[in-house]
Structures are given as structure tokens and as C-alpha cells.
Amino acid sequence: MTDTFQDEAQIRSILDDGAKALYTKDADAMVAHYADDIVVANLAPPLRNKASEGRNKGVLEQWFDTWSGPINLELRDVHIEISGNLAFAYGVSRMSGTKRNGERPDIWTRVTHCFRKERGEWKIAHLHDSVPFYMDGSYRAATDLKP
């Protein structure tokens, strides 16, 4: 197996670990593959988080507490590009589950992970989730789209 195949397998494993951590609502596991200086631009405000906020397990735990059961994450159409000690993976993800208030979110988002190899291990240096907006003047988030 070449280094590129090994690197891609490691990155896919990290993505799988993230989905498992989300499902079990394990904040420690969620941040285990984060670089110390990670920048997170997820769906919740603000526009982006500082590195110290991106690794904040307390914020994750508060969000996990808004769900009554597991949080499902499906990654689809994942493409990975690797060059030296940098890599990125992008695709679409589906998040679903049941909130404590009875809501049952089931939304697809666009997702990009940027990785940096540090001391022989791939770490997530940047994480970005987004949804498109309808450009009909309403600027509503298009959370009803499906691949």
C-alpha cells in the first residue's frame, strides 16, 4: 500500500470516528482528531470560531443535550485530495435524529474538512459546514434539498 492509500485510509477513518462520536454524543471523541489551532465554521453562529472555541467540549455537550437520542450522520460522495502534509475532504452529509422538544431534523449540508499531518498523524485543521440559500429574494436556507 502506498503512502497516499494509507493516508486516505487514515483520513476516512477519522471521518468515520467523527460520525461515531456524534452518534454517541461523545465530546472527547469529537475533538480527538482536531488540531490545536482548528478553525470551525459550522452551521451555528458565529461565522467562524477561534481555535480555542473549536475545541470547546462544553459547547458540544450543551448541544448534545438538546437531542433525546443518538445523532445520525451520513457522509456521502466524499472526495479526498492529498498533497504532502495537507489534505482536504469534501462531500455532503445528512444529520438526523430527535430533539428533546420532539423535532426530528433531517438535513443535508455541504461539508469540507481540511487536514494537516502533525508528527505523523492527520489532524483536522479546518472544518466547514454550509447549506445553500434560495436566491429568489427570500434568502431562506435550503435545508429541504436532498442529493
Language-model features and meaning:
Residues M1-A9, L145-P147:
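Basic/polar N-terminal segments that are highly enriched at the extreme N-terminus
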Residues F5-E8, S13, A27-S83, V92, ...:
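A solvent-exposed, acidic/Ser-Thr-rich amphipathic alpha-helical stretch
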Residues R12, D16-K20:
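Amphipathic alpha-helical repeat scaffolds
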Residues G18, K25-D26:
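Short helix-adjacent coil turns
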Residues G91-T98:
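Generic short beta-strand segments
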Residues W108-S138:
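Short beta-strand edge/turn micro-motifs at domain boundaries
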